[in-house]
């Protein structure tokens, strides 16, 4: 079984046991009440789909999780068969990273239109916009919305750093792709 994202264990454990300081479902001991978190809890906890996920996890031979936070949700229930294997990146040619410090930081943030609050990009965008306002001569800010992954990667090129998910502990695909190209 693959534990790679939204499922019954992720929704239940982060809403009930709360082993992480923050997640898609909690900040501290408080449950997040944004639209996406509420909808995902309703979709996975105590539903046929959620029960199927529980059954599959119980009956499978092994569970592979792709992020540390997903491992935290499966491992307490299935310590003998839960394994964390980080998401891979395909290493291409070595990125060209300039040795000199740029005059302006080129900062990139990609926004998923309907998932901004859920991912925390709304908070990061406000912070970046404040820095841009306070230090316009120090920051170039590129904001994109709703791009397919290939276009996202092309648009990100030339950036020094990206802002991605506020509530994630481990790099997901966008930051891994960025690091592969020498972008922080």
Describe the residue ranges of each PLM region.
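Short catalytic/ligand-binding loop motif for oxyanion handling, primarily in non-cytosolic enzymes
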Residues: 7-12, 71-75, 92-94, 116-117, ...
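Acidic donor-binding loop of glycosyltransferase active sites
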Residues: 157-170, 181-184
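Conserved donor-binding/catalytic core segment of Leloir-type glycosyltransferases
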Residues: 83-119, 125
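Active-site proximal beta-strand in glycosyltransferases
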Residues: 1-35, 82
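Short alpha-helical segment that forms part of, or immediately flanks, the ligand-binding pocket
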Residues: 153, 175-180
């Amino acid at each position: 079984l693959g534990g790679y994202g939204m499922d019954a264990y992720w929704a239940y454990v982060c809403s009930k046991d709360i082993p992480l300081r923050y997640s898609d479902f909690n900040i501290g001991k408080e449950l997040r009440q944004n639209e996406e978190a509420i909808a995902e809890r309703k979709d996975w906890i105590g539903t046929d789909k959620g029960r199927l996920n529980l059954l599959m996890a119980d009956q499978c031979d092994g569970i592979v999780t792709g992020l540390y936070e997903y491992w935290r949700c499966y491992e307490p229930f299935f310590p003998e068969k839960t394994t964390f294997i980080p998401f891979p990146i395909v290493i291409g040619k070595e990125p060209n990273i300039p040795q000199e410090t740029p005059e302006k930081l080129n900062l990139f943030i990609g926004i998923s239109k309907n998932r901004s609050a859920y991912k925390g990009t709304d908070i990061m965008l406000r912070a970046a916009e404040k820095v841009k306002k306070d230090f316009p001569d120090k920051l170039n800010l590129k904001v994109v919305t709703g791009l397919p992954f290939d276009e996202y990667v092309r648009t990100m090129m030339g950036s020094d750093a990206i802002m991605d998910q506020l509530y994630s502990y481990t790099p997901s695909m966008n930051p891994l792709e960025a690091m592969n190209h020498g972008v922080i």
